[in-house]
Regions:
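Ser/Thr/Gly-rich flexible loops in soluble cytosolic domains mediating phosphotransfer, phosphorylation
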Residues: 72-99
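A short, structured N-terminal alpha-helical element that caps or precedes a catalytic domain
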Residues: 1-71, 80-81, 171
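Residues that mark the start of a beta-strand
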Residues: 1-4, 30, 107, 120, ...
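Conserved residues at the C-terminal ends of beta-strands
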Residues: 6, 52, 75, 127, ...
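Conserved SAM/AdoMet-binding glycine-rich loop
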Residues: 146-193
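Conserved acidic residues
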Residues: 46-49, 122, 160
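Canonical Radical SAM [4Fe-4S] cluster-binding loop centered on the CxxxCxxC motif
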Residues: 104-152
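Short amphipathic alpha-helix with an adjacent loop that forms part of the alpha/beta core around
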Residues: 38-47, 63-66, 142-155, 182
Length: 193
C-alpha cells in the first residue's frame, strides 16, 4: 500500500503520524510524509491518506487537504467534537512505537511522562481529551537510544535531549514526578518542557 502522512500544523514532530509511520512500515507499506496539504505534481496515487491537525485555526488547511484527498482520515485536536486516537483507528488498546525517520533532522527524544490535566483552562482540550492526570511513561520509555544521523548517514547514540510534551508534569502523583526528575538528573538529560 502507498500511504501519505500529512502534518497539517505544528512545529514539533507529530507523535500520531510517527506511530502511523511505524505501524504501516511494519506492515510493509510505502510511507510518504509531507507538511503540504496540496498534492504534488509527481505524487503517486495513495491507498490511504492521513492528516493530523492540532490547532482549531487550521480548519482551512484541513479543508484544502480534504479537497485534494476526499477520503483522507484527519485526526488531532483541531476539532473538539471528534477526537479519535491512532490506537482507536488501528483497533489497538495501546501502541507506543514511533518512526523518527520521517523527521530526519530532529535528534531529540519526544514524548509524555504524564497525560491529562488537573486544571480546567477554558481554551484547552486536554482535560476533555485525556481526563485526569496520570503517569504514562518513564524517561527510559521515551529516550530512543539510537538515531540515524542524516549528515553522517549512520546510526549513532541519540543525544541525551528530551522534549517532554506533558501538559501538567507536576499534576501526576508526587512519587512519579520525583522519579522522573531523578531519571533526568541521573541520566544527564537536557530537557525542554
Amino acid at each position: 500500500m502507498h500511504v501519505r502522512l500529512t502534518q497539517i500544523d505544528g512545529k514539533l514532530p507529530n507523535l500520531a503520524l510517527m506511530k502511523l509511520a511505524h505501524w504501516h512500515r511494519a506492515c510493509g507499506d510505502d510511507v510518504y510524509f509531507t507538511k503540504k496539504v496540496e498534492r504534488g505534481m509527481f505524487e503517486p496515487n495513495y491507498d490511504i491518506v492521513y492528516g493530523s491537525a492540532i490547532f482549531s485555526h487550521s480548519g482551512g488547511r484541513v479543508e484544502s487537504l480534504l479537497r485534494e484527498f476526499p477520503d483522507a482520515i484527519v485526526g488531532g485536536t483541531w476539532r473538539l467534537d471528534v477526537i479519535t486516537t491512532v490506537e482507536q483507528h488501528l483497533g489497538l488498546e495501546t501502541y507506543e512505537q514511533y518512526d523518527y525517520s520521517i523527521y530526519p533532522h530532529f535528534d531529540a527524544s519526544l514524548g509524555f511522562t504524564q497525560r491529562g490535566c488537573r486544571l480546567k483552562c477554558g481554551f484547552c482540550v486536554v482535560p476533555k481529551k485525556e481526563g485526569k492526570p496520570r503517569s504514562v511513561n518513564t524517561i527510559a520509555d521515551i529516550y530512543r537510544g539510537v538515531w540515524f544521523n542524516p549528515t553522517l548517514r549512520r546510526d549513532e547514540p541519540a543525544p541525551r535531549h528530551l522534549h517532554l510534551l506533558d501538559n501538567d508534569f507536576f499534576g501526576q502523583p508526587e512519587e512519579h514526578w520525583r522519579a522522573r526528575l531523578d531519571e533526568i538528573r541521573d541520566g544527564k538529560f537536557k530537557v525542554c518542557f
